[in-house]
Amino acid sequence: MKLFIDTANVEEIKEVNDMGVICGVTTNPSLVAKEGRDFNEVIREITSIVDGPISGEVIALDAEGMIKEGREIAKIHKNMVVKIPMTEEGLKAVKVLSSEGIKTNVTLIFSAGQALLAARAGATFVSPFLGRLDDIGADSIGLIESIVNIFDIHDIRTEIIAASIRSPKHVIDSAEAGAHIGTVPYKVLKQLIKHPLTDIGIERFMKDWKEAFNK
């Protein structure tokens, strides 16, 4: 499973990109607003750091507006992916944008049916939301498995991005369920790095080294 980082914070992106573990970035209006900077400015800076898919989301709710905004987002950089909400108007926009060769990421997916519709409309990516499904007691990983199964049976090339990830367990469960990509918040990526036994092991190695050579 490939890993993206889910943030609009440039410093977080730089830090994680330097580790060599991510190959893309997802943003949304909330994440960009949190940075208090111009959308285009933030996105352009991100494209200069990560050479991979960068999702930027439309604000419009009607198909015409989404298409217009999507075309503008696509012009920013060759790696841009237009993030579209899973609605009737969103599907119309995806159909048009995909026909123009513009990559799309249909977001706010909460059912296998929604994922199938988005894929058939031409979506490059679909983003089922794990954390929000967990909040209502739904089986989020079961949803990933269902979408993977449907796409495999019918040879659908749309990639599945596990989104709304809140813990390292979400990441591992998504990978085991067959998601192509997990888009992971900075905090969770950092949590994935650490393990108490790793720290203990390093301390023991250093102690043994000092005892052997620094007598």
UniProtKB/Swiss-Prot annotation:
Q: Name one Pfam family in it.
A: TAL_FSA
Pathway the protein acts in? Carbohydrate degradation; pentose phosphate pathway; D-glyceraldehyde 3-phosphate and beta-D-fructose 6-phosphate from D-ribose 5-phosphate and D-xylulose 5-phosphate (non-oxidative stage): step 2/3
Give GO terms for biological process: carbohydrate metabolic process; pentose-phosphate shunt
GO cellular component term, pick one? cytoplasm
Q: What is its EC number?
A: 2.2.1.2
**Keywords noted in UniProt:** Cytoplasm, Pentose shunt, Schiff base, Transferase
Q: Does the keyword Cytoplasm apply?
A: yes
Superkingdom of the organism of origin: Bacteria
What reaction(s) does this enzyme catalyze?
D-sedoheptulose 7-phosphate + D-glyceraldehyde 3-phosphate = D-erythrose 4-phosphate + beta-D-fructose 6-phosphate
User: Where does the UniProt annotation locate this protein?
Assistant: Cytoplasm
User: Does the entry feature the keyword Cytoplasm, yes or no?
Assistant: yes
Q: Give the residues annotated as active site.
A: 83 (schiff-base intermediate with substrate)
SUPFAM superfamilies in UniProt: Aldolase
Q: Which family does it belong to?
A: Belongs to the transaldolase family. Type 3B subfamily.
Known function? Transaldolase is important for the balance of metabolites in the pentose-phosphate pathway.
**Sorted alphabetically, which HAMAP family does this protein's record hold?**
Transaldolase_3b
Q: Please state what the protein is called.
A: Probable transaldolase
Organism from which the protein derives = Clostridium acetobutylicum (strain ATCC 824 / DSM 792 / JCM 1419 / IAM 19013 / LMG 5710 / NBRC 13948 / NRRL B-527 / VKM B-1787 / 2291 / W)
Gene that specifies this protein = tal
